[in-house]
Swiss-Prot record:
The keyword Lipid metabolism does not apply. This is Meiotic expression up-regulated protein 18. It comes from Schizosaccharomyces pombe (strain 972 / ATCC 24843). It comes from the Eukaryota. GO terms for cellular component: cytoplasm; nuclear envelope. Residues 275-289 have a biased composition (Basic and acidic residues). Keywords: Meiosis. Residues 293-304 have a biased composition (Basic residues). Residues 267-305 are annotated as: Disordered. Disulfide bonds: none annotated. One of its GO terms (biological process) is meiotic cell cycle.
Amino acid sequence: MIYINFYELYNIKNIRPLIPSFHVCLLIMFLILYSQEILSFFFMCSKFSMNSLKFCVLFSFKTVYSLLKLIKTLIRKLLYCFHYALDLFADEYKVTANDKHYDYRLKSHRIKDKITTKCKGTTKYFNSRHFEIKNAVENLPSFSSNLTTIGNNLRIFWKNGKIRCIKLTCTPDAEIVNFTSNPNRYRFYETNMQELIRKTICEKSDKAIEKTFLCAQLFKTFCEDGVLQTFQPGFIQLDIASNLQEIKKGTKEYSLKSLEMTTTKESNETLCSNDSKHRIARLKNEDNTQKPISKKRKSKKASHKYLSSRTAPNVDFGNFAKERHRENDVSELYSKTKRTSKIRELYKEIGYDKNEFIHELRENEGPSVLYDSGLDQNGTNYDDAFAAPEAISIEKYVSINEEDPKSPKKETSYQVQEKLSQFFQEEMIHLLEMGEACTSRESQKTRKKNLKENIRKQRTTSTAIRDIAIKFLDDAKCETEDSTNLTNREGEAEKTLNTQPWKNLIENFISELQAEEEENNITEWSDIISVRNDEENQIYELPTCQLETNLLV
């Protein structure tokens, strides 16, 4: 006998209708009985039975069974051809699960529900749309490869343990991740999960990387019970804003590229702001009997291009001086090792060797710059006297680096200049703190009193800023020089004011003075500070400002 397995020739698996096939059979029988008479129906049945017997003589029973199975499959395919395209016109789906038997019900309105998941002993909620499970296929196999969102687009579709089409839609802040599947629009990729990840993701990982997470760990966290346990092809939306970081920490295998994607601005803030903030917070909590902190100085020009995001702390430096004078340990307040290591890293990023760098500084600026930059006269050791923002003379040095065609990192000079500028701005806070710590209380009061008198007498912002610069230089170096060296210090202060970092600090200082509107008897004046740059010959004009008597207290 001839055996032909029609069902295996045209194998359409896992096609489930929206209504049972038994109801379809009853409907067909009703139509036949309604249109034909009973006798004709019996005659038709007898004729059909005779033909069936003749057919069974020629072919085996298995052949007839396979043919009937094929007819049944074709009927399902024709009647419910829109089953795969169900997500094109339906708003939502509702899924009920019972031992891998699923009931599909089409809804005309959106259904939203809250699903509870357990994450590291705590119960967390996330909004999830109901999604369609096409059939009871195998569970999603676990794997340890990292899924990376490339260009915010990555879709995943799997069937019987194999990925067909993969695409994921992720918001820039990674608050919502959408897993969608649509086999009617996208071409299938008949391959296993590991190969697809290696081909489509790992080879393109050098492009725009937004978020990286371990897919298997993500599924284990959010798919612990219920229908989500057997994750099937379909649509799901997860809110992972509060769980993504915990998933990263709890996973041993994850891409380190996500940790390296910190921008230059974030690294600068980490470089400059941590030490001073922790130090100020520690000193504020040491003594509960400390005097109340002075009022905060809020600048009206918050959008000024020279204003840094980290301004000087609004604290009473006199009280801090008492605490530091009691400790008698300036090195504990400001770590020399950390700061010098940062300077070494900045030297390396420019692209020059340290010996060449020292040689250029010695020729262009003289030995004083070497001392201010933390180097001794021989240029071999790093010192703790980081006195002024002009120490490394970064503007002149970067210009030399850009003109040199042999420079290995010519394109990074501007980034290094910005990084050093922000680093110097944060050093201003350290100079204030160290200056108050090194000098005695009597000299502090005398210096501040003389400074106030000079401000009242001269009433020029240029002289006031110059005196402030001298105070910063003297206090940072912890020097007790005679009045005969005042001229040299003024010249050094003028040289300091000509550098770009100090220009930024001066304008920041003036903008803070403009925001002060206290009741004082100091008269108001208008003056222009002409800070001339020898190379560009530019004049920076500063607007009207108002000072008060307790400004530097």
